[in-house]
Amino acid sequence: MKSLADAVFPAEVFSLPLFHGISETGRTALVSSGWLRTCSFEKNQTIYHMGDRVSELGIVLSGSVFVENTDLWGNRSILSKITPGQVFAETYAFCREPMMVNVTAAEASTVLFFNLRNLDQTADGDDAWQSQLRSNMLRISMQKNLTLSNRIFCTTPKTIRERVLVYLSAPVSYTHLRAHETRSNL
């Protein structure tokens, strides 16, 4: 017999990194308490506007979305393309800060929204799954932080030549660091 969570959402939803290690009880609680909802968007439809205060992070289930900046003259810069399984707006939802970017559907897309306001409350004495959810969110945010750091390292040099050298040397530096770490642990 299918659980409530599996009956409402496809099994792939709960295999996403955000829900890794969440018990069946936790998944059922997420669904029954209304923490999750899905919404479909057409190409170029705005999901979040700059200045919005949001309480839900989004996870792309199908299609893709752009995180973009639009300047005063209407020039649009795409900062990131979010593909299926990836999370967006988690920092704004968690910190309750106004969005500094727009989020727009790059193509017909389906997004799972997860309401973070509920995460501040405990669930009927069984909050082990909430702790796991917080840990998963932290892991996702830290991975994004590392990606941003790498992007900053690559764009900080002044010339294109220096940027390319930094970009190409990163894997070599990482491999050298890992080899040194391994030798140190022997």
Question: Model-predicted segments: where are they?
Answer:
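Amphipathic, well-packed alpha-helical segments that form the structural scaffold of globular domains
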Residues: 31, 35, 142, 146, ...
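Phosphate-/nucleic-acid-contacting segments
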Residues: 160, 167-184
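Basic, amphipathic alpha-helical hairpins
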Residues: 122-127, 148, 171-174
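Cyclic nucleotide-binding regulatory domains
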Residues: 45-107
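N-terminal positioning helix adjacent to the helix-turn-helix/winged-helix DNA-binding module
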Residues: 133, 156, 160-163, 167
